[in-house]
From Swiss-Prot:
Signal peptide: none annotated. Its EC number is 4.-.-.-. Belongs to the CpcS/CpeS biliprotein lyase family. This is Chromophore lyase CpcS/CpeS 2. It is an enzyme of class 4 (lyase). It holds the Pfam family CpeS. It comes from Synechocystis sp. (strain ATCC 27184 / PCC 6803 / Kazusa). Covalently attaches a chromophore to Cys residue(s) of phycobiliproteins. The keyword Lyase applies. One of its GO terms (molecular function) is lyase activity. CDD domains: lipocalin_CpcS-CpeS. Keywords: Lyase.
Length: 192
């Protein structure tokens, strides 16, 4: 599997349940997300624009993905908003197409255009490593089956890990899509 095949397999609507461990506080927080993924071809205007934004030759891109999400976390305050969109563009290394440059118009940890690295590991998981000005994020996505995707991520700030997250993402049919709602703290023990 290559990264574009991973994005094509990820296309559609997903419902995510996650637990984020705030390591410095020794506390865990649960949350839910509604996620939409659309694989984009190399000639898609969004891919061309992201490449140009990062001063990269669009002809080197193999495609990418558009992602939209709406999320809620158990500790959210009333005015907190966890929703947005981003576009990923993939530019594989010339000597190894299983890894390369990942361009984003918007990062997750910091809302700025960002370039990171991606690779497909030996278990066909997509691994994204993004270095921000004040932190590093490492995300790993893999499929348990075609309708169940798993994700882990860590955020390291100033030399120490401060969050670790585990997500279970289930594919949903269009008619079953609902908005994310705050997850009670006990939900992690209740299943779906």
């Amino acid at each position: 599997m290559d990264a574009m095949e991973f994005f094509r397999n990820s296309s559609g609507n997903w419902r995510s349940q996650r637990t984020t461990h705030h390591l410095a506080f020794r506390r865990a927080e649960t949350g839910t997300s509604e996620i939409f993924v659309e694989a984009l071809g190399a000639d898609d205007q969004k891919i061309v624009e992201i490449c140009e934004m990062h001063d990269c030759d669009p002809a080197k891109a193999v495609g990418g993905a558009f992602v939209r999400w709406e999320s809620a976390m158990a500790w959210d305050k009333e005015d907190e908003n966890h929703e947005g969109t981003t576009v990923f563009a993939l530019i594989p290394d010339e000597d190894n197409p299983q890894q390369g440059l990942l361009l984003r118009e918007r990062g997750y940890a910091e809302i700025v255009p960002i370039a990171g690295r991606y690779h497909i590991d030996e278990e066909e998981a997509l691994v994204l490593v993004t270095e921000y000005e004040t932190m590093t994020t490492i995300e790993r996505f893999w499929f348990a089956n075609p309708d169940m995707r798993l994700r882990t991520s860590t955020v390291q700030r100033f030399g120490g890990f401060n969050t670790a997250t585990y997500c279970t993402e289930m594919r949903v049919k269009e008619e079953n899509t609902v908005s994310a709602s705050p997850a009670p703290a006990y939900e992690q023990f209740c299943g779906w």
